[in-house]
Amino acid sequence: MTPPTPLMVLGTSSGAGKSLMTAALCRVLKRRGEQPLPFKGQNMSNNAWVDQSGGEMAYSQALQSWAAGLEPNCAMNPVLLKPQGNSTSEVIHGGESVGMARAETYYQEWFKPGWLAIRQGLEQLRQQHPHGRLVLEGAGSPVEVNLQHRDLTNLRLAQYLRARCLLVADIERGGVFAQLVGTLQLLRPVERPLVKGLLINRFRGRQELFDPGVSWLSDNTGVPVLGVMPWLDELFPPEDSLDLLERRGRKANAELEIAVLRLPSLSNFSDLDPLEAEPSVQLRWVQPGEALGQPDAVVLPGSKQTLRDLKALQASGLARELQRFSAGGGAVLGICGGLQMLGRELLDPDGLEGAAGASAAGLNLLPLQTRFGGSKALRQRQAVAHWPTAESCPIEGFELHRGSTIALEPLQALCQEEGLGWVQGQVAGSYLHGLLENGRWRRQWLNQLRRRKQLPELAEDQGHHSLQREELLDRLADAFEANVDLTPLISDP
């Protein structure tokens, strides 16, 4: 039996909504009895996930795999570039770190190995799911004319697989007609027939007022507009950290304010999604140089460059503000790189984050020492937490870090399992990404904050955040089915 024709979601630009439209398409196809196989040949992101085998992949492909009813598999994202700063990225092939690349030499040195990794990922998925339909996501714009000859993940892949493409444009940015018409005009003659439909994303207003524009696009491009998706940004956060400052406004019923430090090399900010989803919690992102204020708690999230981000906090004065906040009894939670910064000392003997033999004083909110080195810890974990309450609380998540941390003084462990986290007073840190997805643990931590404000406690019998994520994916798919006609994409001639 021949597998169904692959589909591909292209965008007129970065941030057009490709990732969520791909997730929506996966969930809709799953509802229709197909087995969608999400795939993005190359992604650039520090928002990562670790699959069951310990392979590293972009979080957006993990989200798409859940939409497809599958466990995340690093074969779905065979090339991941993790920016380090200074035009340098860590290169992940097939879930494993294979080196560092500089922007100016990336395609000379990494193009052929990248294309090989992409084909190997495709082959692995097809072997595992021979009757599944590939649902591909492009990257950025497919018509960057100076880069087309070095394209790894847009139209090169679409041509290789003879995929039917859906071109998405974000009307919220303005200029949607120029976005779509310009992109189509810049396609090469062999590429344009691959585009079977157009999609307008993030529309706000009365649809009937835009209908003449829809007709104009179809008539003047010869490509049908398959749908107009409404504004749905309240469902999921944007994928890229550059969009964080454009996040939602204040919640009407928020009772707790939690400040999150927006580190220059911020990573895995999806760890904060469960807090963002709490109706009573207002997140406030604070950049170095901005005032910390008097929040109810502070979260230090993950970092791709822990020493560099720590230096930025110290140089801006935000580190001193955080130390004063903690000395006054303020609650602080550090995750992964944030945990490392909370410690007393950070050592880098092999120069993984800078000059060999470098060391730095931490925030000294926990008596910990972190030594960078050795192989990267990449594994899913199940553990039992004994804080913020003494009762046992099962939790799960994943580790994704280099280096090891030890306590320099007797210190309360956050978990029964050694080395996953430590606590002293109101300051806690953990290596466990996904910690806040554990509903019962999250509510225990929030109730600790609420008691300090004499607020009534929240129910703690909360399921894992994945249950809420499933509801959001269904709402996304509902909107997609209601507003998009897939017939030209999925119907065989």
Swiss-Prot record:
Residues 255-441 form the GATase cobBQ-type domain. The active site is at residues 336, 433. Pathway: Cofactor biosynthesis; adenosylcobalamin biosynthesis. Keywords: Cobalamin biosynthesis, Glutamine amidotransferase. InterPro entries: Class_I_gatase-like, CobQ/CobB/MinD/ParA_Nub-bd_dom, CobQ_GATase1, CobQ_synth, GATase_3, P-loop_NTPase. It comes from the Bacteria. GO terms for molecular function: ABC-type vitamin B12 transporter activity; catalytic activity. One of its GO terms (biological process) is cobalamin biosynthetic process. Coiled coil: none annotated. Gene3D superfamilies: 3.40.50.880, P-loop containing nucleotide triphosphate hydrolases (3.40.50.300). Belongs to the CobB/CobQ family. CobQ subfamily. Catalyzes amidations at positions B, D, E, and G on adenosylcobyrinic A,C-diamide. NH(2) groups are provided by glutamine, and one molecule of ATP is hydrogenolyzed for each amidation. This is Cobyric acid synthase. It comes from Synechococcus sp. (strain RCC307).
